[in-house]
From Swiss-Prot:
Organism, scientific name: Burkholderia multivorans (strain ATCC 17616 / 249)
Gene Ontology biological process terms in this record: lipid A biosynthetic process
Reactions accelerated catalytically: a UDP-3-O-[(3R)-3-hydroxyacyl]-N-acetyl-alpha-D-glucosamine + H2O = a UDP-3-O-[(3R)-3-hydroxyacyl]-alpha-D-glucosamine + acetate
GO molecular-function term, one example from the UniProt record: UDP-3-O-acyl-N-acetylglucosamine deacetylase activity
Name of the molecule in the record: UDP-3-O-acyl-N-acetylglucosamine deacetylase
First-tier enzyme category under EC: hydrolase
NCBIfam families assigned: lpxC (TIGR00325)
Family membership noted in the UniProt record: Belongs to the LpxC family.
Gene3D superfamilies linked to this entry: lpxc deacetylase, domain 1, lpxc deacetylase, domain 2
GO CC annotation: membrane
Gene: lpxC
Length: 305
């Protein structure tokens, strides 16, 4: 049986919120089979638990934001991406602010945290959402699409007319049957343009943003002294985001995802469109792990490896 997974022990870290600039304490705790990934605002007078789900995503303008009973947890996509990449099904995420800390702007810190805690298989079958029919959403020239596929692969195209981005490649296709999430995707950082950062700060946003947690570009070049971690880091980060956005559906997808200029809002709209058509998907499990797609028949250290 291909089993559900959680972490072995509690692990904690401290970082800053990308937009608030405030210190955030983050605690990851093991969770029982069938729990899913549950975020908890432990700083509130009465803590609020917000299970990750497609229907709980509210604001998507700058990040994926979970909302419930007036409580928010923002910028969940990098942590969710790490959970997807490591095959974590069940987890409690305690936070002391309304933002998940940005860390270094990628998913690498969350991968390290989860691996430090250890990964534990649980005596319950891992559940997948198998896409049975194509589903697509569009917004002008932007689109995101899911097609039936026995595994998980993504094709993402960006279109930033910028000399530094043009040189790195604007399209990427990855099949996790033969690609390691940890090695090839997790370290890709978020990016932004210097003039946009200044505008956002005037609006009280991006107060925690710096070249320690983002790739920053001016009109012509990358400003970070250390350059890029991957030759195609820009499109890889958009793929990292998409993996996290899609994982809020509650289970790993067995599907092919194709996107052009998609973002958090369109990714969430795609999940809602999928869930609105009961004939477009089914929940499946695998009694024999070897019968699962090769990207998911992993050991307890890595997924998509």
């Amino acid at each position: 049986m291909l089993k559900q997974r959680t972490i072995k022990s509690i692990v904690k870290t401290v970082g800053i919120g990308l937009h608030s600039g405030r210190k955030v304490e983050l605690t990851l705790r093991p969770a029982a089979p069938g729990t899913g990934i549950v975020f908890s605002r432990v700083d509130l007078p009465t803590p609020v638990d917000i299970p990750a789900s497609a229907m709980s995503i509210g604001d998507t303008r700058l990040a994926s934001v979970l909302q419930k009973d007036g409580a928010r947890v923002s910028t969940i996509e990098h942590l969710m991406s790490a959970c997807a990449g490591l095959g974590i099904d069940n987890l409690y995420v305690d936070v002391t602010a309304e933002e998940i800390p940005i860390m270094d702007g990628s998913a690498a810190s969350f991968v390290f945290l989860i691996q430090s805690a250890g990964i534990e298989e649980q005596n319950a079958p891992k559940r997948f959402i198998k896409v049975k029919k194509p589903v697509e959403v569009r917004d002008g020239d932007k689109f995101a699409r899911l097609d039936p596929f026995f595994g998980f692969k993504l094709k993402f195209t960006i279109d930033f007319r910028h000399p530094a981005v043009d040189k790195t490649g604007q399209a990427l296709e990855v099949d996790f049957a033969n690609t390691s999430y940890v090695r090839e995707i997790a370290r890709a950082r978020t990016f932004g343009f210097a003039h946009e950062v200044e505008m956002m700060r005037e609006l009280g946003l991006a107060r925690g943003g710096s070249m320690d947690n983002a790739i920053v570009l001016d009109e012509y070049r990358i400003l970070n002294n250390d350059g890029l971690r991957y030759d195609d880091e820009f499109v890889k980060h958009k793929m990292l985001d998409a993996i996290g956005d899609l994982y809020v559906v509650g289970h790993p997808l067995l599907a092919s995802y194709t996107a052009y200029k998609s973002g958090h809002g369109l990714n969430n709209a795609l999940l809602r469109e999928l869930l609105a058509h009961e004939d477009a998907y089914e929940i499946v499990t695998f009694d024999d792990p070897q019968a699962a797609p090769s990207g998911f028949a992993f050991d307890t250290q890595t997924a998509f490896a």
